[in-house]
């Protein structure tokens, strides 16, 4: 996400990836349906972080679960709230989200260097 924010300001960005492909862990996380976030209130959401909640509050409030959903929508990846309150992409897959994100990054001029 940092690469996207910086590149959107016109700053050249190069992402160095240790693996041979982009988003390997992201794709693995998506194998179970890609639970992106939760739809509960901010206070309840923060309570999940235990003792670290107050330290993390400014960062999470700066990019909230609703902001994450809007970001996905901006990539053309609609989300929905499941019966558990968890938020998922409508596709239930990580790969469409990753492809859309990579396309956005490349359109912003972000370069990728992968481990050979």
Report each predicted region and the residues it spans:
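Short glycine-rich, polar/acidic loop-and-turn segments at beta strand-coil junctions
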Residues: 17-20, 40, 75-76, 116
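Short, hinge-like loop/turn segments at secondary-structure boundaries
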Residues: 30-35, 98-99
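Glycine-rich FAD pyrophosphate-binding loop
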Residues: 7-31
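Glycine-rich active-site loop/strand segments that organize a redox cofactor
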Residues: 33-81
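Feature captures the FAD/FMN-dependent oxidoreductase FAD-binding
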Residues: 61-116
